[in-house]
Amino acid sequence: MSLDISQFPVLAQANTPNELRQLPQALLPQLADELREFLLKSVGMSSGHFASGLGTVELTVALHYVYNTPFDRLIWDVGHQAYPHKILTGRRDRMHTIRQKNGLHPFPWREESEYDTFSVGHSGTSISAALAMAVAAEKEQAGRKVVAVIGDGAMTGGMVFEAMNHAGDLHNDMLMVLNDNEMSISENVGALNNHLAQLMSGRFYTTIRESSKKVLKGMPVIKEMAKRTEEHLKGMVVPGTLFEELGFNYIGPIDGHDVDALVETLRNMRNLKGPQVLHIMTKKGRGYEPAEKDPIGWHAVPKFDPSLFKKPATKPGLPTFSQVFGKWLCDIAEQDEKVLGITPAMREGSGMVEFSQRFPKQYFDAAIAEQHAVTLGAGFACEGYKPVVAIYSTFLQRGYDQLIHDVALQRLPVLFAIDRGGIVGADGPTHQGAFDLSFMRCIPNMVIMAPSDENECRQMLYTGYCYDAGPSAVRYPRGSATGATQVEAMTALPIGKGVIKRLGKRIALLNFGTTLAAALTAAESLDATVVDMRFVKPLDVDLVKEMAQTHDVLVTVEENAIMGGAGSGVLELLQQLKMPKPVLQIGLPDEFIKHGSPDEVIHDLQLDAEGMLAQINAYLAN
């Protein structure tokens, strides 16, 4: 149910940017307050990304007020912070559906709105897209402006600097708004973040701020900023130095929660020539005390009552697979000080908080830089360490060349703990772990494991730790484990060997991963054999051969793209063995999987027991 818009009298007048631009500027502070309150109540009703959007309310209002969107292009990096943008661009009455099946997309999405000029979800893409749009705008000579909004967390990724370097060289008109809240999903790390953090200290921050104030009062922008920088800050490392060296004109920092200052500054900068950076300081979670105090914990939230100032208590239940991994990592680190945990800025999500606290010298946050994280692991392996790279399936895509060139080619024993394999649900197509089995299976020297439950996950992680002939990967899903009894003792599994879980007749289900429980349920109605294959690569050749010889039909089951996945590996093996056999592949279709709850998505894709049974019966009937 949507909120009663009559409770928000100014916001009610600004359902679109055109309506917003008709408001007198004096009403913008009230509009920002109402927008923040609407966002707070809306996310409380629907769940979703929370703290980031609270921090960009004033910026969103100012951008749509000054720029002629959608004619002028506005690109949001990642998109966590774009909920206010959705509210102001005609989607206010559907905000309660965000991230839900058939509801609003969780991120800016081109198919959803003309105001969403570039579909996003992964970090660091906005500057490249904005540069291309700026070049196109110059070719068209229609007076179109281009703005990219990027957070300080995304500035730790190399793609951003590749794009900025190119933009500085081409020198097209574009604006990059650096939203500096000193907080991405995990604390930012590295020299750049330390550089930005200096803004908050004493004379250094005050001097830059005063220079920017003079710019705001109408002085010739580029000339005056250069003059003040030279006079006051010569010989010091100033915030703008990095951007100036890359060919950008730097303005800031300014208060990102002062909507009037933002409007005036954006007006001043709108017609400046060449690439520009506006550096704004914001607070993630602004306006809601619990989120201000704990922006990481309030990054994304379930449904909650804002008036209670706390998230709903989580019911005691099964551990998540991320927690299973985190516990294993701590257990193995106690035994071996050469175990090193690496994450690309996903400490909380990957279950590594306890490890980072207990073993700080063995913990490495590579920031939002997946390529670097993978090759960092390769370098450690060269020196005899035991690197464990904990990474989401969707983000491993970003380190694919490094996986091939730096790890597998050299047969380096790097263990990849791949979280969020398969359906992740509400974050949609940018985050579904649909492709990892396919893109890893074709890489020589890889060992790929898919546990069916938490105990098997623990043993497979240990197997990967023990394996020193090359890289290995353990791929597990988001969410709660299955409830299997965990065995504390760790035993390395025989490489490339599966286990028969149920003996039946005629039909054999070859299962890869946590779809095992559903496969067993479906098998009861079919009196089918079920095999927990365990290894996607190498396949258990003897077991596949045995199943083909003793059954009429084989069915492969995986929560991965059918094309190139584990089932394709079974078909390739049967071809090599010259054993023609009917094989039904159950998995993800050749399409990007939309958002919805995991259960809804799995049901729609017929990956639950009911759906598997229906697919198998239809195959047998034909």
Curated annotation (Swiss-Prot):
Its EC number is 2.2.1.7. CDD domains: TPP_DXS (cd02007), TPP_PYR_DXS_TK_like (cd07033). Binds 1 Mg(2+) ion per subunit. It holds the Pfam family DXP_synthase_N. Its cofactor is Mg(2+); thiamine diphosphate. One of its GO terms (cellular component) is cytosol. SMART domains: Transket_pyr (SM00861). GO terms for molecular function: 1-deoxy-D-xylulose-5-phosphate synthase activity; magnesium ion binding; thiamine pyrophosphate binding. Keywords: Isoprene biosynthesis, Magnesium, Metal-binding, Thiamine biosynthesis, Thiamine pyrophosphate, Transferase. Pathway: Metabolic intermediate biosynthesis; 1-deoxy-D-xylulose 5-phosphate biosynthesis; 1-deoxy-D-xylulose 5-phosphate from D-glyceraldehyde 3-phosphate and pyruvate: step 1/1. One of its GO terms (biological process) is terpenoid biosynthetic process. PROSITE patterns: TRANSKETOLASE_1, TRANSKETOLASE_2. InterPro entries: Dxylulose-5-P_synthase, THDP-binding, Transketo_C/PFOR_II, Transketolase-like_Pyr-bd, Transketolase_BS, Transketolase_C, Transketolase_CS. Thiamine diphosphate binds at H80, G121, H122, S123, G153, A154, N181, Y288, E370. It catalyses: D-glyceraldehyde 3-phosphate + pyruvate + H(+) = 1-deoxy-D-xylulose 5-phosphate + CO2. The keyword Transferase applies. Mg(2+) binds at D152, N181. Homodimer. Catalyzes the acyloin condensation reaction between C atoms 2 and 3 of pyruvate and glyceraldehyde 3-phosphate to yield 1-deoxy-D-xylulose-5-phosphate (DXP). Belongs to the transketolase family. DXPS subfamily. This is 1-deoxy-D-xylulose-5-phosphate synthase. It comes from Shewanella oneidensis (strain ATCC 700550 / JCM 31522 / CIP 106686 / LMG 19005 / NCIMB 14063 / MR-1).
